[in-house]
Amino acid sequence: GLLGYADPDGIVFYHLPAKRHTLATEFRVDAATVLPRVEIIYVGTTSQPGVARAAVQAGAKGLVIAGTGAGSLGNLDQELAAIAAEGIPVARSARVGEGRIVRDDNWQQPGMVAADNLSPQKSALLLALAMQASSNIEAIQRMFDSY
């Protein structure tokens, strides 16, 4: 429903967002900020191992997986687990229009974060901001849970 109203006398909120956003953020970015490179890898039933490794070899410091359904890693599961084990954050998101990516031991390996309901594009931006703020994967997951 409506969060509130924007009228000539000001903005009135009746419902506040549950997640942090915009000015209520821990991230500090200015014109001189260079964010870490994050690549989005689209995964489907015909995805072949090697594409995620190629992105890392080309300079990606983090990866966002645009998976099917609930963020499935498809044929890239072992490759992505190895990349995450090397300390390169991997965020699981979905390329479908709705739904959440939840933490689940069947799909998620150590070093991976669940992107909740964020699109792959929003996940890539948040992962870059999170990586600038921390290299700790638990802290990065907390940021994905918060925004």
Name each region found by the language model.
Residues 1-71:
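Accessory alpha-helical/coil subdomains and C-terminal extensions
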